[in-house]
From Swiss-Prot:
There are three types of ferritin subunits in amphibia: L, M and H chains. M and H chains are fast mineralizing; the L chain is very slow mineralizing. This is Ferritin, higher subunit. Fe cation 2 binds at E59, E104, Q138. It holds the Pfam family Ferritin. The lineage of its organism: Eukaryota, Metazoa, Chordata, Craniata, Vertebrata.
């Protein structure tokens, strides 16, 4: 059944938003996996775990925001299966941050692709929504992860376990 509030909302935009919801849920699921990996008794980097748990929550909120906007515009939410994270073991903090950086770049590219669909279908509401709610935040996340990777390397990772401990205690502890 078609929505009575739908206006200037192309079916391609609606489908692309549903795919983006799935991407955000996948990112949330991946960050949740990372969080509980670093919370294990044999890893015990609790501030790193907390950081990844916060990232998971943020990605889930992004998915919910997209779904809310989909409903507001008169679109229909069609959820897909969420793929499991690419791995279960995340190695050291440097490896996990590098994986997180790649994930954020993938999410950012998906958002840019969604923006292009909105632009191609002349949907200023979608473009404004993405520009206001997502794009700047993605750039900030990518920069933050890049900074963390630089500092982890500076501390001697992956060879230096003490550097990983200090990063967890001081860098991640301060951002809590």
């Amino acid at each position: 059944m078609d929505s009575q509030v739908r206006q200037n909302f192309h079916r391609d935009c609606e489908a692309a938003i549903n795919r983006m919801v799935n991407m955000e849920l996948y990112a949330s699921y991946t960050y949740l996996s990372m969080a509980f990996y670093f919370d294990r008794d044999d890893i015990a980097l609790h501030n790193v775990a907390k950081f990844f748990k916060e990232q998971s929550h943020e990605e889930r909120e992004h998915a919910e925001k997209l779904m809310k906007d989909q409903n507001k515009r008169g679109g229909r939410i069609v959820l897909q299966d969420v793929k499991k994270p690419e791995r279960d073991e995340w190695g050291n903090t440097l490896e996990a941050m590098q994986a997180a950086l790649q994930l954020e770049k993938t999410v950012n590219q998906a958002l840019l692709d969604l923006h292009k669909v909105g632009s191609d279908k002349v949907d200023p509401h979608l473009c404004d929504f993405l520009e206001t709610e997502y794009l700047e935040e993605q750039v900030k996340s990518i920069k933050q992860l890049g900074d963390y990777i630089t500092n982890l390397k500076r501390l001697g990772l992956p060879q230096n376990g003490m550097g990983e401990y200090l990063f967890d205690k001081h860098t991640m502890g301060e951002s809590s």
